A protein has these predicted regions:
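Short catalytic/signature loops enriched in Gly
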Residues: 12-18, 156-160, 250-337
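A short, flexible loop at the N-terminus of ABC-type nucleotide-binding domains that lies
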Residues: 15-19, 28-41, 72-78, 94-97, ...
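P-loop NTP-binding/switch modules centered on Walker-like glycine-rich loops
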Residues: 71-72, 188-195, 199-280
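ABC ATPase NBD coupling module
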Residues: 76, 90-107, 125, 133, ...
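Conserved ABC transporter NBD signature motif
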Residues: 79-89
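Conserved ABC ATPase "signature" region
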Residues: 88-89, 141-160, 269-270
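Conserved signature/switch motifs of ABC ATPase nucleotide-binding domains
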Residues: 103, 167, 185, 209, ...
Length: 337
C-alpha cells in the first residue's frame, strides 16, 4: 500500500495490520513538586517499511515516548496504556524478555553517538560484541558481518575502521557506526532520537539518505524523533505533532505539510527558515512551552495560539476528522489556512 493510499485509510483499518500499535500511551514522573505527565494518551500505528516522524518543541514528550517503548524510563517514571509489537504487548515486559526484544527486533539510535560508544573499546569490538552475544556468531563471523554492515552504511575503508577508537571518527562517522550497530540484528523497528542534531547540514543530508536506503533494503519501520521539519519532509511517511505531551495533529506527511489543520503545526512550519525569504522577518511561535506541572486549563497551546477562543478553555477532543487524520482543535481547519 502506498503512502497516498495509507492517508485515506481509516485509522482503525491501519491498526489492523500494523507492526506497532500504540494506544493511550501515558508516561508520568513523580517529582518533589508533584506528578508530571510527559506523555498524555498518545495513539499511533506503524507498518513495516513506514517511517513516522514525531515532531515538536523541546519538552513535548517526543523522547519520553521512545524511552517508554524501549523500556528505558527513569526510575521515577510510570507507564500506562498499551503498545503491541507484532501483536505482542511490550510495555512492562520482564527485563530478560525486554533485553531480547531490544537486541533482536527493536533498536534505537541515540542523539549523541560519542556518549553511546565505549571510548575504551575499538569500534569493531563493540560491533562484534552485539553479534556474538545475540546471534551466537564466532569471532571471525562477527568480524566479517560487522565489516559488511559498515560497508552498508557507506563507511569508507570499513575493514580498516574496525581497529579504530570512537575518538578517531568524525561526528558523522560515529553516527554511521551507531546506525550500523542498530541494524546488525536486522531489527523490524528502528527508533532514531534526534540522530542528526549535532551534525552539519551536509552530513545530515547524508544520514537521511542513508536511512532511506536502509529502510528500503531491510523493510525496516522507523520512528524519527526530531524538531527539524526538514528532516521529516525528507524521510517520513506519517507525522505526529506533539505539544505538552499530547497529540495536536497526526496524518500523512504530505497532508500535514501542505494542509496543516492545527495552529501549532502551522506555527512550526512558518518558523522554518526559507531560502527565498531574504530580508523578511523570521517568524516564531510567541511565548514558551508550558510548565507540565502547571498546564493551562483546556488546550495546552491556548496561551500561545493566535486563534484562541473562549471555548479553548475546555480541552478539545482528538478527532479523526477525515480518514487517517487526527486533530485536537475547535477551530475549523479551513479557517486556519
Amino acid at each position: 500500500m502506498s503512502v497516498i493510499e495509507t492517508a485515506t485509510v481509516p485509522l482503525a483499518q491501519q491498526q489492523a495490520d500494523a507492526l506497532l500499535n500504540v494506544k493511550d500511551l501515558r508516561v508520568t514522573f513523580s517529582t518533589p513538586d508533584g506528578d508530571v505527565t510527559a506523555v498524555n494518551d498518545l495513539n499511533f500505528s506503524l507498518r513495516a517499511g513506514e517511517t513516522l516522524g514525531i515532531v515538536g518543541e523541546s519538552g513535548s514528550g517526543k523522547s519520553q515516548t521512545a524511552f517508554a517503548l524501549m523500556g528505558l524510563l527513569a526510575a521515577n517514571g510510570r507507564i500506562g496504556g498499551s503498545a503491541t509489537f507484532n501483536g505482542r504487548e511490550i510495555l512492562n515486559l520482564p527485563e530478560r524478555e525486554l533485553n531480547k526484544l531490544r537486541a533482536e527486533q527493536i533498536s534505537m539510535i541515540f542523539q549523541d553517538p560519542m556518549t553511546s560508544l565505549n571510548p575504551y573499546m575499538r569500534v569493531g569490538e563493540q560491533l562484534m560484541e552485539v553479534l556474538m552475544l545475540h546471534k551466537n556468531m564466532s569471532k571471525a563471523e562477527a568480524f566479517e558481518e560487522s565489516v559488511r554492515m559498515l560497508d552498508a552504511v557507506k563507511m569508507p575503508e570499513a575493514r580498516k575502521r574496525m581497529k579504530m577508537y570512537p575518538h578517531e571518527f568524525s561526528g558523522g562517522m560515529r553516527q554511521r557506526v551507531m546506525i550500523a550497530m542498530a541494524l546488525l540484528c536486522r531489527p523490524k523497528l528502528l527508533i532514531a532520537d534526534e540522530p542528526t542534531t549535532a551534525l552539519d547540514v551536509t552530513v545530515q543530508a547524508q544520514i537521511m539518505t542513508l536511512l532511506n536506503e536502509l529502510k528500503r533494503e531491510f523493510n525496516t519501520a522507523i520512528i524519527m524523533i526530531t524538531h527539524d521539519l526538514g528532516v521529516v519532509a525528507g524521510i517520513c511517511d506519517k507525522v505526529l505533532v506533539m505539544y505538552a505531551g499530547r497529540t495536536m495533529e497526526y496524518g500523512n506527511a504530505r497532508d500535514v505539510f501542505y494542509q496543516p489543520v492545527h495552529p501549532y503545526s502551522i506555527g512550526l512550519l512558518n518558523a522554518v527558515p526559507r531560502l527565498d525569504a531574504e530580508g523578511e522577518t523570521m517568524l516564531t511561535i510567541p511565548g514558551n512551552p508550558p510548565n507540565l506541572l502547571r498546564l493551562p486549563k483546556g488546550c495546552p497551546f491556548q496561551p500561545r495560539c493566535p486563534h484562541a477562543m473562549e471555548i479553548c478553555s475546555s480541552a478539545p477532543p482528538l478527532e479523526e476528522f477525515t480518514p487517517g487524520r487526527l486533530r485536537a482543535c475547535f477551530k475549523p481547519g479551513e479557517e486556519l489556512l
